[in-house]
A protein has these predicted regions:
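DNA major-groove recognition helix of helix-turn-helix
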Residues: 48, 73-81
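Short, basic interhelical loop/turn and adjoining N-cap
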Residues: 54-73
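Short, low-complexity, charged amphipathic interaction modules
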Residues: 107-128
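Short, amphipathic alpha-helical "recognition" segments used to contact nucleic acids or chromatin
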Residues: 37-53
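Residue-level preference for well-ordered alpha-helical positions
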Residues: 16, 48, 59-60
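Short, Lys/Arg-enriched anionic-surface-contact patches
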Residues: 14-40, 65
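N-terminal leader segment of winged-helix/HTH proteins
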Residues: 1-14
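Short Lys/Arg-enriched helix C-cap and helix-to-coil transition segments
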Residues: 81-107
Length: 128
């Protein structure tokens, strides 16, 4: 298992812990209970927004999910994150746990943020 897969597996485990959901129900995509949907929604949002996995790539992690369902979950979670305090609190807990898991040693999120900043600067210079 490579580092990226370890991070993704940990993200799935943390989202399941937060919502008390069964990991296999999320992966197999065959359960519509509230806790499963909430955990799956958070997991998909994280994969899309933080791991930069495209909607069409979600099927690698969740069986038989199509890109439209992935888009729906990301948009719905984004709305809930902006609207509901409890979702915001749970997601902050999730992010804190993910940062603790830091398998890159020097801070994956910080490095990613720095790379994006440098890419933006390069694009700005290129366009000027």
């Amino acid at each position: 298992m490579n580092t990226r897969d370890k991070i993704i597996t940990h993200a799935l485990n943390i989202s399941c812990e937060i919502y008390n959901a069964n990991k296999n129900n999320i992966i197999s995509n065959n359960n519509r209970s509230s806790s499963t949907i909430k955990a799956k929604r958070m997991f998909i949002y994280y994969l899309y927004e933080y791991m930069e996995i495209k909607h069409t790539g979600m099927k690698k992690y969740i069986k038989d999910i199509n890109h439209a369902s992935s888009i729906h979950h990301v948009n719905k979670f984004h709305f809930e994150l902006q609207t509901y305090e409890d979702v915001k609190k749970y997601f902050n807990t999730f992010l804190t746990e993910m940062k603790k898991f830091n398998v890159y040693g020097g801070g994956f999120y910080e490095k990613r943020k720095e790379i994006k900043k440098l890419l933006n600067e390069l694009n700005k210079i290129k366009n000027d």
